């Protein structure tokens, strides 16, 4: 009986290896990076930006509070997103990547002890889309559970 099982296993292995030697194209084609986004941008955070994300907001952790309206700066360089809340004097750095098809992915904090959008219970990662027209960059949250990051990043940014 065990010899019969062995033979069946060997035959199954051979059958699995049968087929064309041609490589099938991948289901998705890789997109290229979007180096044209590199640079420094500015925008103003408004009351409307903050109110738009109130349904996501949880400021229950120590030292957490809503952002205040005011000037923001955004730097995009070599996989690093740097956002500065000028009025609060807070700078936050996160990994990011952008592709030519408009995907904008935000990864881990680079120095969470120096600044973070949300507390440790909120995922660090997020998915946005981007569009650029001339010197204007528009970011829009697709999936972001952090209200403060969404309030701050979603909107039109002017290149400086």
Predicted feature descriptions by range:
Residues 47-53, 58, 66-70, 74-144:
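Contiguous, well-ordered beta-strand patches that form the walls/edges
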Residues 26, 124-129, 152-159:
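Extracellular/mature segments of secreted proteins
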Residues 19-38:
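Short, low-complexity, disordered segments immediately C-terminal to signal peptides
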């Amino acid at each position: 009986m065990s010899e019969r099982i062995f033979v069946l296993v060997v035959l199954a292995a051979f059958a699995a290896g049968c087929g064309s030697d041609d490589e099938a194209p991948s289901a998705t084609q890789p997109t290229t990076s979007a180096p044209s986004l590199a640079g420094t941008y500015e925008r103003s955070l408004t009351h409307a930006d903050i109110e738009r994300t109130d349904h996501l907001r949880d400021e229950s952790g120590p030292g957490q509070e809503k952002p205040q309206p005011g000037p923001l700066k955004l730097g995009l360089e070599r996989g690093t997103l740097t956002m500065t809340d000028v009025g609060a004097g807070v700078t936050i750095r996160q990994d990011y990547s952008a592709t030519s098809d408009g995907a904008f992915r935000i990864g881990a904090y680079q120095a969470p002890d120096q600044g973070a959008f949300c507390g440790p219970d909120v995922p660090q990662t997020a998915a946005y889309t981007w569009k650029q027209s001339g010197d204007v960059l528009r970011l829009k949250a697709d999936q972001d559970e952090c209200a403060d990051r969404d309030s701050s990043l979603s909107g039109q940014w002017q290149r400086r």
